[in-house]
């Protein structure tokens, strides 16, 4: 059930063996934490937004929520999620499996600092039945991220 595109993407960057297949869905932060056996905060949720009519991906800790003011300061627009029925077309992945690995090259990937407090984080692996275990630094390398950002709120209370 693994996503071959994601498997090859990770393998080509030296992260072979990090993709884990699950018997139950990990389509939400809650489901992912239950299947992986970690806190919900350690789930690296991948959100896809429209900025200037183009997709942008932001990966953040599972307990983080988008802070509109911080988002606008970075992207110069209010946060607007990609409509659910357009997620596959724009990112290459279905909702519940969107990940920062193997998205089209013209989509910038940002990592929120909310994940830096953890030894490991767990983003989806391209579908709702796979995840990847990486340190935040490894996630930065594996995702070809633009860099780190600060667009979340809510997670500071749980540090």
Where are these regions (language model features)?
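Extended, low-hydrophobicity, polar/charged segments
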Residues: 1-159
